[in-house]
Amino acid sequence: MSELRLAVMREDIPSSSPISCGIASIDDRIKDAYSKTICKQGLAYNIYVDGYLIGNCMIKLVVLCDEANDYYVTDHEYAALEISYIAIDRRVQGNGIGTRVLARLISDAEKLSKILPIRFLVLDALDDKVQWYLDAGFTTYPKREDLRYADTVPMRI
């Protein structure tokens, strides 16, 4: 099996080795990933396989509101870790790399939730990726509509 490595971004992705997952809105987010990492608005990782840069992903902390349950002490807010996106270059998609990255992010989130008050790992899935996330153990959940990501399905694990 090839070596998978996630490394925190230390600079913008060079224009000489661009990454495109084939979805313009996600490709645009990759362009801002390093800036968001510097400003502590998220943590972007470059994804390497056998030393080659083949993708990028981002996680961040979010605060969600769960008004449906009544077991909260004072309010209905809780912290969650969000996978903002996973982008694998379209030239290497279909080889299981995204599945390995997702498994790694799930494992890392489970470890963090043991030392930090993180309740869920959440994401907004594109319609054509919902089954992929279901297969990884995610479920859908009700969430207030987020107009920034209107064509997505909220999911959590």
Spans of model-derived segments:
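Non-catalytic substrate-recognition and accessory regions of acyl/acetyltransferase enzymes
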Residues: 1-95, 100-122, 126, 130-157
